Amino acid sequence: MSTKKRRMEYISFYNHTGLEDHFTKMAKKGWLIESISNFYWTYRKIEPKDLHFCVTYYPRASDFDPGPSEEQQTFHDFCAHTGWQLTCTWHQMQVFYNEKENPVPLETDPVMEVETLHKACKKNFLPSYFLLLALGLLMGAYFIARIFADPIGLLSDPSHLMTGTAYVCMAIISITELLSYFLWYAKAKRAAQNGIFVDTPSTASLQRVIVLVIIAAFAAWLANILLSGNTLLKWIVFLMLGYMVAIFAIVNGIKQGLKKLKASRGLNRALTLAACFILPMVMTALIVNITLTATRSGVLDTDFKEDVAPLNLSDLMDANNEDGLTENRFHETILLGYRVVHQRDSKFSLEGTSSAPDLKYTIVTVKAPFLYDWCKEQMYYEQDETHSDWPVGNRMIYKEQDPAPWGADAVYRLYSEEGWWAYTYLLCYEEQIIEIRFDWEPTAEQMAIVSQKLNP
């Protein structure tokens, strides 16, 4: 049986009430907290017992310190003399436990406890969350603004959806943590004047939800990459994930190694920060070099094509699309699917002849019904110039057509106010919205084929 357990916990740095309760419950189950890090907490196997825990804060401490200062050590010795054993430290946090049934409390002055905790939070907790809040609000606002400007492009792209979701979650958790802390601090500061301790609040439930949402978004993004046929993209993603893990591991290893070597706080901080700047540049250059070498040697196939297009020129006429100039892009999320296909007959395109048959279509598959009208409006006004600055009489506008030949719910065709019809159509089906552009007048038979191929 393992004597160690590592867990990801959801207890805020300042929530000493929640920390003490949690450590007490874990001790009753036979697990004593041994170390705390930004990524996981480590517990050591012990005999199940009732232990009392006390979480205190030492504002002058730093995570770069090689060990406790003389003042800290004196405090630790005093605590040990009264039965409080130090089990671990984390930044300015100190965790003690006591096996006595009714131990003498370490914190007896509410005013000093509140102010000491506040000073400790100003060293790391508050600056970190203010930075995350600024970044989350800035990028989250940009993400939300883009949703209104280009919902199809954003909500159908796993990468954009993942990063946007992460930034919005970052803003939410930062606001919640900071608001919870300052509301508690104001209340605790007033109560302390009357000798009353106020329990710290918990945001654990929200933290769990946020983590699950981010994991789900990341899993969806990764699955989309792995299921694609793009070998080069898979290779780059694999290298970048390894790059991020390596950066965290190496930087943390440097910091911990310097602490074991008893390097001063200033030297440790300087070398660790230098590693944070230098390592990403070195590893990025290494990844680029590896990718280029693998590509040139033929290990990676850069001649990537998506799966077979659902509709080809050869389905509509006697044309060759084996070697044609074809664009076939596709990506999707749980909300939307998006595909763009552009094809010309290679017999003509290779000669550069302007009469080459040309076909281009965009398919938006709406998986979330509440997005349908939104997507339709975007696709409609990408071509329709009704609300543009173009003078009346020179605009391109959509006019409704008979949907029966297309087997659609609604069909619109682009029309010039100068009096001629374009060969661009907007086809609306139950779950799909399709914009298709020909360079010829499609026949009824071709319309039926389009419906059969694109909306089977």
What is each stretch, according to the model?
Residues S180-A204, N252-N268:
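Cytoplasmic membrane-interface regions of multi-pass membrane proteins
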Residues M1-Y10, S228-I236:
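N-terminal pre-first-transmembrane soluble regions of secretory-pathway and organelle membrane proteins
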Residues W235-G242, G298-Y423, Y429:
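Short, solvent-exposed recognition patches
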Residues S2-P127, A145-L154:
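Membrane-protein extramembrane domains
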Residues E435-P456:
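Surface-exposed amphipathic alpha-helical segments
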Residues A120-Q193, A204-A223:
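Core alpha-helical transmembrane segments of integral membrane proteins
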Residues A220-I254:
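Membrane-embedded alpha-helical segments of integral membrane proteins
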Residues L261-T295:
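Internal/C-terminal transmembrane anchor helices
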